[in-house]
């Protein structure tokens, strides 16, 4: 699908369809008012007859409106004007895209980017429209033998901006929006792949392909079990012992800043391509969704794709920690004591608290890069889902400025995170009689004690932890990966690269 921006008046558009907003109760947006004036009150007469109230998501498709060059006008309800916030704006865009696609409008000029969204500029509105449009049109049908496609799909979308001065920022918004949307799609595709296809080897092959596609800036190295053993990554290796699939750690290095002083930002993604729970096996119900336990790695992969696509002038390293947690004759057990790469020992009380055992070794491994900051992304705890539900990602950090930066980026991107504490009081719950620490700390504050566990391996750099257990995928009828937090991390890196969207 093609996107572009222009600045023009609605009556001069020769497009197949013009999209304008209507507020409650039956109030025309400024652009809709212009069209109403040209058509001698045709639109307002329809509203007076009760054809459209203007409630969020309501639509009315008009054909051959008098004195208007465009074949169709799509009126879309935007709710009350003062209540049009970021969430509602995105819902209106989503409804617009779905309606255009369903009604066979192959091209459209959208004036919704001229609506006032509190505290948001044209760049934000255009970029969010692009990302939302791509999200609305996403489908995962690679493994279906029959694919359903609309007869006349939407192919071209033009966003109108209020002044010619804003064309440049609109074009940049499209460029950024497309790159982020492609990263989200890549993350969703990886997440939705079944575990018999998407194992650690598959993740590694995707990482290598990324380096092939962006060979100018990206180098990928894949570290296998033998090398991990030599590095002393015994905790990571223990988790994969029960699986026939080899554990593989894929390290994707992107260099956008040639300066020797430029330290990299490191992103670490938990890549449990299937988590049965191991010997502490999970219940059968919903176990199929444990293919999504690699959504952290999928998100990191998506972000690395975005960074390479936009050629950001920063250095970023993405680590996909690929592994599979299965029961078997070689599987690690409750009661085992593991020696981590850092030298610290861990008593395993539950083999289903495996993500932290993989991440702790990777967090030690990345010390060699002397990072500016390290952010790990993981579907880590069910406790985070209890604390924050399925709408907001959990954030913990040992560095206040980094935490504030990430929270700010999450608000900018509309991919929200909320900070949880990392107090020393919680560390007591991880005490063990037989090792330096236990791998679980009981039910109270489970998301926080998991963060506290990881914090013991991140003392040499600024670090943040994103627990995406509640936000990485949806269950039920709309089951599928969400691609979060690609948008959040993309915004964070855009800000670091000097593209914060404040035109």
UniProtKB/Swiss-Prot annotation:
Single GO MF descriptor: metalloaminopeptidase activity
Active site as annotated: 282, 356
GO cellular component, one term: cytoplasm
Cofactor field: Mn(2+)
Cofactor annotation comment: Binds 2 manganese ions per subunit.
Pfam family for this entry, one: Peptidase_M17
Residues that hold Mn(2+) 2 according to the record: 270, 275, 293, 354
Residues the entry annotates as binding Mn(2+) 1: 275, 352, 354
Keyword Phosphoprotein tagged: no
Catalytic activity: Release of an N-terminal amino acid, Xaa-|-Yaa-, in which Xaa is preferably Leu, but may be other amino acids including Pro although not Arg or Lys, and Yaa may be Pro. Amino acid amides and methyl esters are also readily hydrolyzed, but rates on arylamides are exceedingly low; Release of an N-terminal amino acid, preferentially leucine, but not glutamic or aspartic acids
Matching SUPFAM superfamilies: Macro domain-like, Zn-dependent exopeptidases
Keywords: Aminopeptidase, Cytoplasm, Hydrolase, Manganese, Metal-binding, Protease
This enzyme's EC code(s): 3.4.11.1, 3.4.11.10
PROSITE patterns: CYTOSOL_AP
Top-rank taxon, per record: Bacteria
BP term (GO), one: proteolysis
Intracellular or extracellular location(s): Cytoplasm
Alphabetized NCBIfam families for the sequence: PRK00913.1-1 (NF002072), PRK00913.1-4 (NF002074)
Biological role: Presumably involved in the processing and regular turnover of intracellular proteins. Catalyzes the removal of unsubstituted N-terminal amino acids from various peptides.
Family: Belongs to the peptidase M17 family.
Protein name: Probable cytosol aminopeptidase
Organism, scientific name: Enterobacter sp. (strain 638)
């Amino acid at each position: 699908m093609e996107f572009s921006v222009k600045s023009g008046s609605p009556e001069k558009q020769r497009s197949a369809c013009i999209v304008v907003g209507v507020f409650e109760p039956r109030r025309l947006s400024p652009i809709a008012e212009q069209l109403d004036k040209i058509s001698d009150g045709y639109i307002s007469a329809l509203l007076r007859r009760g054809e459209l109230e203007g409630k969020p998501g309501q639509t009315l498709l008009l054909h051959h409106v008098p004195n208007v060059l465009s074949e169709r006008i799509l009126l879309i309800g935007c709710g009350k004007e003062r209540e049009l916030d970021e969430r509602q704006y995105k819902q209106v865009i989503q409804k617009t895209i779905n309606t255009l696609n369903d009604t066979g409008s192959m091209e459209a000029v959208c004036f919704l980017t001229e609506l006032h969204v509190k505290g948001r500029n044209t760049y934000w509105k255009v970029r969010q429209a692009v990302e939302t449009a791509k999200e609305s049109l996403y489908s995962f049908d690679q493994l279906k033998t029959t694919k359903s496609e609309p007869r006349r799909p939407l192919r071209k979308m033009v966003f109108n901006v209020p002044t010619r001065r804003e064309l440049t920022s609109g074009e940049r918004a499209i460029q950024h929006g497309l790159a982020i949307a492609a990263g989200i799609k890549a993350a969703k595709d990886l997440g939705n792949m079944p575990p018999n296809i998407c194992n650690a080897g598959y993740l590694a092959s995707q990482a290598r392909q990324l380096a092939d596609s962006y060979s100018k800036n990206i180098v990928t190295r894949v570290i296998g079990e033998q090398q991990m053993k030599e590095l002393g990554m015994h905790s990571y290796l223990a988790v994969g012992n029960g699986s026939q699939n080899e554990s593989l750690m894929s390290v994707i290095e992107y260099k956008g800043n040639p300066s020797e002083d430029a330290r990299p930002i490191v992103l670490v993604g938990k890549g449990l391509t299937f988590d049965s729970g191991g010997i502490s096996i999970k219940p059968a119900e919903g176990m199929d969704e444990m293919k999504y336990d690699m959504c952290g790695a999928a998100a990191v992969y998506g972000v690395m794709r975005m960074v390479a696509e936009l050629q950001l002038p920063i250095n970023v390293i993405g680590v996909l920690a690929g592994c599979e947690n299965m029961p078997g004759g070689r599987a690690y057990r409750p009661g085992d004591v593991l020696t981590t790469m850092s030298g610290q020992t861990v008593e395993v009380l539950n083999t289903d608290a495996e993500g932290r055992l993989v991440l702790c070794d990777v967090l030690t491994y990345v010390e060699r890069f002397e990072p500016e900051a390290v952010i790990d992304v993981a579907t880590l705890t069910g406790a985070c889902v209890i604390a924050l539900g399925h709408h907001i990602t959990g954030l913990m950090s040992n560095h206040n400025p980094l935490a504030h930066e990430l929270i700010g980026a999450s608000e900018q991107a509309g991919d929200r995170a909320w900070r949880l504490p990392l107090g020393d009081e919680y560390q007591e719950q991880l005490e063990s009689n037989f090792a330096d620490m236990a791998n679980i700390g009981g039910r109270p504050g489970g998301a926080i004690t998991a963060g506290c566990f990881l914090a013991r391996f991140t003392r040499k750099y600024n670090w943040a932890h994103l627990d995406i257990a509640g936000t990485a995928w949806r269950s039920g009828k709309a089951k599928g990966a969400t691609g979060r937090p690609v948008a959040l991390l993309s915004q964070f890196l855009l800000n670091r690269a000097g593209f914060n969207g404040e035109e």
